[in-house]
């Protein structure tokens, strides 16, 4: 029987508890889950690819069938094909996410019909989380511990300044 390999692509800048929840759930569905740190050419990242990989690896250390990989600058579907993945995981927080992700899934299917996109609905507690909002909260000294895994929290404050400690 063929090993079921799924890719969970994203910029993960930073990796959030919502991302972690999606990875945990995907790890129960697939033999292997590759969390692919992608480059979003329309954004200036806070964390380097190496930092993202380290933070994702630390955050998913308890999940033996999960690994983090840096994806080269190319189409996600091409990356998935290159590692033998048959599935792409996408987390859906709301209707806006669904519309956007459905369009991308359609194009990806046109590019490679052998790779299926699987949507996982966000747990209600994570449906308002976004990396952009978390960076903003951290930059102004807000407490982000309930939004990100502990390694990410420490890295955020190290990057943005530890303003929340001075309150």
Swiss-Prot record:
Catalytic activity: (R)-4'-phosphopantetheine + ATP + H(+) = 3'-dephospho-CoA + diphosphate
Binding locations of ATP: 11-12, 19, 91-93, 101, 126-132
Positions that bind substrate: 11, 43, 76, 90
One GO CC annotation: cytoplasm
Gene behind this protein: coaD
Organism superkingdom: Bacteria
Keyword Nucleotidyltransferase tagged: yes
Entry cofactors: Mg(2+)
One Gene Ontology MF term: pantetheine-phosphate adenylyltransferase activity
The protein's Enzyme Commission number: 2.7.7.3
Gene3D superfamilies with a match to the protein in the record: HUPs (3.40.50.620)
Lineage, top ranks: Bacteria, Bacillati, Bacillota, Bacilli, Lactobacillales
Function: Reversibly transfers an adenylyl group from ATP to 4'-phosphopantetheine, yielding dephospho-CoA (dPCoA) and pyrophosphate.
Marked site (Transition state stabilizer) residue numbers: 19
Subcellular location field: Cytoplasm
Ranges in a coiled coil: none
Similarity comment: family membership: Belongs to the bacterial CoaD family.
GO terms, biological process: coenzyme A biosynthetic process
Pathway entry: Cofactor biosynthesis; coenzyme A biosynthesis; CoA from (R)-pantothenate: step 4/5
Protein's UniProt keywords contain Cell wall biogenesis/degradation: no
InterPro entries linked: Cyt_trans-like, PPAT, Rossmann-like_a/b/a_fold
Protein name per Swiss-Prot or TrEMBL: Phosphopantetheine adenylyltransferase
Paired cysteines (S-S): none
Organism this protein belongs to: Lacticaseibacillus paracasei (strain ATCC 334 / BCRC 17002 / CCUG 31169 / CIP 107868 / KCTC 3260 / NRRL B-441) (Lactobacillus paracasei)
SUBUNIT field: Homohexamer.
